[in-house]
């Protein structure tokens, strides 16, 4: 998995163009060795603590450059996309940018495909920060908060630091997000996201005005099209179960970091924690 990410990220880079920090958090496989095998501009940090926000903070402490781009290890983003994000921030006018997510549905069951068909029609699909696995911050933007707090929804925490006019999703570039293959894995991943959202709203209610538009009105409009009804039923079914699961865990303070191994292939060994790269 990390080889796929780093190859796409670094292919064609000019000397000294990138400073890439890979933080292997709780990894028990060969992730660190694979990352080091790429050589410059990759730097690798290892920590025994399998905690994403801890990894983000470690990476931030050693990262040298701005704009600073945060990339989940299980998505694919090309060098041209990285350049586009950096160039947009350098032009000014916004503080945070992200690419638009492209969901790779290879190997996914029909219900999963139906779910993402509906998702891509909703306003939240246009929010790259928190959906694409990639976001870029200017130096001024990074000063908006201190360390990443120990929250599940770290990317949403970043997004709500900025008003709508301070952030932008670039529709001309994309990140490839690998969707879970089965509906059970999809529900688990959605429940994790919902848990993070509920937790963030509880801990930082003062930031919630920056969350962005909801999906309810757009979702209701889709019901005007009978050809979408079956897909809408699946979407609503997944969302209802995920929200219920997340609320129960929040009530009992019982969070489990749900990981989708179906979209990771051999790289997603059950005992390995995914690294975060910056």
Where are these regions (language model features)?
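Short beta-strand/loop segment that forms part of the nucleotide-sugar
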Residues: 6, 17-26, 45
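Short, well-formed alpha-helical segments that are part of the catalytic scaffolds
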Residues: 1-11
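Glycine-rich, basic loop-to-helix element that forms the pyrophosphate-binding segment
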Residues: 33, 46-63
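Acidic helix N-cap motif at the loop->helix transition within catalytic regions
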Residues: 1-3, 29-37, 80
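Conserved donor NDP-sugar-binding/catalytic core segment of glycosyltransferases
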Residues: 79-110
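Terminal low-complexity segments of carbohydrate-biosynthetic enzymes
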Residues: 179-180, 188-278
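A conserved acidic beta->alpha catalytic loop
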Residues: 8, 24-32, 49
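Short aromatic/hydrophobic "clamp" motif used to bind/position activated sugar donors
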Residues: 68
């Amino acid at each position: 998995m990390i080889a796929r990410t780093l190859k796409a990220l670094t292919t064609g880079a000019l000397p000294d163009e990138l400073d890439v920090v890979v933080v292997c958090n709780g990894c028990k496989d060969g992730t660190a060795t694979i990352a080091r095998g790429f050589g410059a501009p990759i730097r690798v940090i290892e920590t025994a603590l399998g905690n994403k926000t801890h990894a983000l903070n470690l990476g931030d402490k050693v990262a040298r450059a701005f704009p600073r781009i945060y990339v989940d290890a299980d998505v694919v983003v090309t060098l041209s996309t990285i350049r586009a994000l950096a160039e947009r921030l350098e032009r000014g006018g916004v503080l945070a940018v992200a690419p638009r997510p492209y969901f790779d549905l290879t190997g996914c069951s029909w219900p999963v495909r139906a779910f993402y068909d509906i998702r891509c029609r909703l306003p939240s699909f246009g929010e790259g920060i928190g959906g694409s696995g990639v976001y870029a911050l200017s130096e001024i933007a990074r000063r908006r908060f201190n360390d990443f707090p120990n929250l599940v929804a770290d990317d949403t925490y970043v997004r709500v630091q900025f008003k709508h006019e301070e952030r932008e999703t670039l529709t001309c570039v994309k990140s490839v997000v690998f969707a879970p293959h089965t509906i059970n894995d999809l529900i688990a991943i959605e429940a994790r996201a919902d848990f993070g959202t509920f937790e963030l709203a509880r801990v930082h209610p003062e930031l919630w005005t920056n969350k962005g538009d909801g999906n309810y009105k757009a979702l209701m409009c889709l019901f005007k099209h009978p050809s979408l009804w079956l897909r809408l039923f699946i979407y609503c079914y997944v969302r209802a179960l995920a929200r219920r699961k997340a609320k129960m865990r929040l009530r009992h303070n019982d969070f489990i970091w749900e990981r989708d191994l179906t979209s990771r292939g051999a790289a997603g060994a059950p005992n390995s924690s995914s690294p975060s790269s910056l």
